[in-house]
Structure formats: C-alpha cells, structure tokens
UniProtKB/Swiss-Prot annotation:
It comes from Rhizorhabdus wittichii (strain DSM 6014 / CCUG 31198 / JCM 15750 / NBRC 105917 / EY 4224 / RW1). The gene is htpX. Residues 285-316 are annotated as: Disordered. Its main location: membrane. It is an enzyme of class 3 (hydrolase). InterPro entries: HtpX_protease, Pept_M48_protease_HtpX, Peptidase_M48. This is Protease HtpX homolog. Keywords: Cell inner membrane, Cell membrane, Hydrolase, Membrane, Metal-binding, Metalloprotease, Protease, Transmembrane, Transmembrane helix, Zinc.
Length: 316
C-alpha cells in the first residue's frame, strides 16, 4: 500500500511539473529546468552519504572499538539480507538516528550518543532495524527522485516568474502568476506526503527485521519526547535535514501537510497493529505520559564513561 501511494504521489508530482510547464508555455524551459535540477540532485545522490555524515561530525566505529553496537547492526543486516553497512556514532545529546547512502552496497547508518543513552537494547535494535528497512526499500533513491522533480518545479516557477508572465495577456497572465506561486507549495506538500509514506514503510520493515514492533514503538515514544526537548544544531542550521531522522529533529504537534514524519502517536498505533498481526502484542507505550514528564530524558555527557559497548564512550 505504501509503495502504491508513493507511486501515485510521484505521478502527481510529475503531472504538476508538466502542468506548470504547459501554463508557462513551451517545453524548452521545462526541459532545461528538469535537466539542471536532475544534475544537482544526481550530484547530491552520489555524494549524499559523505555530505550528511560530515555535516553531523559523525565518526565511524567498528567491531574493535564498539563491538556490541556494531554486532547488533551486523545481526540485523544478516536478517534483512543486506550487506553490512558502515556504522557511525554522532556525539550529540539530541537522541536520533538515520540511514544514508545511494544503495544497499554503499549504505551507512548512524546513531547519536543521546539515543544510545536513553534506549535499552531491544529499543536500539528496533531503531536500527527501521534504518536498515530504509536501506532495503531504497528510500534514498525514491526521495532523490522526488527531490529532483520538486526542484525542477521550483526552478521552472522561478523561470516563469521572470520570463513567463510578460509574454501573455489578460487571463493567461493571472493563470501564470497563480501557477508560479502555487506549484512550489503543492510540490512541497506532495514531497512531504511521500516522506511520511516511506516512514510507515520503514516502521513495518523494522518491525519485521527485528521481530520486536513493540520495542520500536517504545523507542519512538522516547525519541520523540527527547528530540522535542533537546536542540538539534544541524536542523536549526538546515531545517530540511529534519527529514533524515527516525523522528523529526524539532518539536511539532500532530500531523500536518508540511510534516516530514507522521505523528508519533499514529506510528505507535500502526506498530500496535503490526504487533497484533505478528502475534507479539504487548502493552503500548504511554506516549502522552512520556510527553508530560519533565526531565525524563537523560543524555550522555561526552566526558562520561560507561561500561556498555552500546555506548561509544564505553571501553567495550
């Protein structure tokens, strides 16, 4: 269902691009915008992993310096029939995780020290299984395709703003101006809808890979609470980065057309249904109670040492 929804939304985005090109007039400008946007996004696609990891100051870890965490990821990768991804740790109190890489053979997964501090092993397993599901579903490729078309729409809208309206009269001018201003917002709405659909798909995939949907649900509740309270410097500098993470990198309430992720309560309900399907149902996490508790999220000071190998500051 999520793949069907994604396909339909991609088709809608493409149709929007074609309609904008037709409104402005002529296919030449539309093709130029598409080629330029595709070139920009192709560069991003091939270099996204290094760009994103450098942006977060991530450091790669291995079985020698972080054996338990790397071993956990390796076990999940085997279950998912995926190549072993590169594993990274980000020294940040903000609790979150993400996957990057253009395909499964070039994938990387990353988690913050803040995440490792507040989740138990089963919850960490659920989170990393979710990220590997993104890798397996090739969500990086899908979102790059989406960004290419959305970027082309924005470029074409700018082209139309400066060159399109002056060559028309009367109602055509009004239609062009309306299209130029409305199309980019419509494209962003569709782009965010695709992002939300991919998150539901990764939640299901993560539950299947780990076999612990209730642990993933519990992790989402804790992470959403912590991520809303502990600032994320990367997202503050670049709000578009919020789409990278397992939970939004900033505080927001409920679903909206411009949200990069479904509401956490809805994701938990979705995972409860999956748990029932798998016959592993258990009491669901009390998201409301978690959200109301102040000071419930701890963090890992970078100078503190712990004995667990899941904490990269530990000695393994």
């Amino acid at each position: 269902m999520n793949m069907l929804k994604t396909t339909m939304l991609l088709a809608a985005l493409t149709a929007l691009f074609m309609a904008l090109g037709f409104t402005i007039g002529g296919t030449g400008g539309a093709m130029i915008a598409l080629v330029v946007a595709a070139g920009m996004n192709l560069f991003t696609f091939w270099n996204a992993d290094s760009i994103v990891l450098r942006m977060h100051g991530a450091r790669e870890v291995d079985a020698q310096n972080c054996p338990e965490f790397v071993g956990l990821v390796a076990g999940l990768a085997r279950r998912a029939n995926l190549p072993m991804p590169r594993v990274y740790i980000i020294d940040s109190e903000h609790p979150n995780a993400f996957a990057t890489g253009r395909n499964p053979e070039n994938a990387a997964v990353a988690a913050t020290t803040g995440l490792l501090a507040i989740l138990n092993r089963d919850e960490i397993e659920g989170v990393m299984a979710h990220e590997l599901a993104h890798v397996r579903n090739r969500d990086t490729l899908i979102m790059t395709m989406t960004a290419t078309i959305a970027g082309a729409i924005s470029m074409l809208a700018n082209f139309g703003m400066f060159f399109g309206a002056g060559r028309r009269d009367g109602g055509q001018v009004l239609a062009t101006i309306l299209a130029v201003f409305v199309a980019p917002f419509a494209a962003m709405i569709v782009q965010m809808a695709i992002s939300r659909a991919r998150e539901y798909g990764a939640d299901r995939g993560g539950a299947e890979i780990s076999g612990k949907p209730q642990a993933l649900a519990s992790a989402l509740a804790k992470l959403a609470n912590g991520a809303a309270r502990i600032p994320n410097p990367v997202v503050e500098r670049n709000p578009a980065a919020a789409a990278l993470y397992i939970v939004p990198g900033m505080k927001r309430d409920g679903d909206s057309l411009f949200a990069t992720h479904p509401a956490t309560e809805n994701r938990i309900a979705h995972l409860e249904a999956i748990a029932n399907e798998m016959g592993v149902s258990s009491p669901s996490p009390n998201f409301a109670a978690l959200s109301e508790r102040r000071g419930s999220v701890s963090s890992v000071p970078r100078t503190r040492r712990r004995s667990s190998a899941l904490d990269p500051n530990g000695r393994g």
